[in-house]
Amino acid sequence: MKIVVTGTRGIPNVMGGVETHCEELFPRIAAKGFNVTVIRRKSYVHDKLKEWKGVKLVDIETPKKKALEAIIHTFKAINVAKKLGADILHIHAIGPALLVPYAKILGMKVVFTHHGPDYDRDKWGIMAKTILKLGERMGCMFADDVIVISDVIRNLIKNKYNRINRVHLIYNGVSKPEFCDYPEYFNELGIEKGKYILGMCRFVPEKNLHHLIEAFSKIDNQGCKLVLAGDTDFEDDYSRRLKETARKHGVILTGFIKGKKLHSLLTNCRCYCLPSSHEGLPIALLEAMSYNIPVIVSDIPANMEVGLSKDVYFHVGNIKELSEKLTTIINTPLTHPSYNMEKYDWDRISNEVIDIYKKLSQ
């Protein structure tokens, strides 16, 4: 069976939740005998790979413009998928889903994964939000099967579009943690084990890293530092202002990191903090939980669905409450809580997606 995937910037080692999702999922599906091709956006990948972990990679030129690239790339990718003779086209995210009807007109079977209502993100203007809402509608109305990554999203599409049939709740997953130390990297950053708070995400407004910096700057940190791991796809006023504020307050910026550097930060941090106002089901949070570290997260529905203890949540946007949570963490002996990660297993998730493919291809 030939599966063609679009809606992601690319794999491997491309920043973003959808990208991490695809990087984990599709090699597992390919390993089970499926012919999988991921269509990548050329401006995000520089490795010149044609195949990775059994997944074929096709790169397409796409203008790197925030408002246009997803739609242009998806249009081109659908045409490539048709030429490749795809049995199933798997489209990720609501922006690319705008073109689900086009794929159906071409006679293709389509699976659509809804990763969250992106129109709620602060970075989009009115026109972009309107297009994203239309994309959500097209995906939910015309895709053969819809995968949702949280119960919040399942209820959303049920209430908005009355889409119940062939809707599948399949959570995001997380890989097994790779515990490690990296003394040379810690010396480079100027941090010590157990003496830093970690924020790990893209530098976009809805992640509210500016709230984390403000909250941290108000507390007696007792020598604990704040480390922000991540960056932005599009350098803009927000990301420039965020980095400037971070440097002003002595926050350590690592840039986009993966592999041993990231694993060492997760292994040894005091706590992970995610203050965001919008999420689908945050893979970064799941990854932090897999390392058995304390977490502090905003009380938005996507984070609440993870089902953590009440004391780790704070009201989104409440700087005072976040400062209090950070102070408590710093003044409490370091702990390593255990979380139930069973439903976030990528191997099980890949089998559930394969079942959808098999039924659709019959």
Can you annotate each of these PLM segments?
Residues 79-82, 105, 129-146:
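Membrane-proximal helix-turn-helix segments that form the acceptor-binding/catalytic region
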Residues 290, 294-297:
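Short hydrophobic beta-strand element within catalytic cores of glycosyltransferases
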Residues 277:
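Aromatic "clamp/platform" in nucleotide-sugar-dependent glycosyltransferases that forms part
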Residues 239-260:
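Nucleotide-activated donor-binding/catalytic signature segment of Leloir-type glycosyltransferases, i.e.
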Residues 312-319, 327-331:
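Conserved acidic donor-binding segment of nucleotide-sugar-dependent glycosyltransferases
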Residues 140-167, 174-176:
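A short, active-site helix/loop in glycosyltransferases that binds the activated sugar's phosphate group
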Residues 4, 190-217, 227:
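Conserved donor-binding/catalytic core segment of Leloir-type glycosyltransferases
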Residues 158-159, 173-189, 362:
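Acidic anion/phosphate-binding donor-loop and adjacent secondary structure
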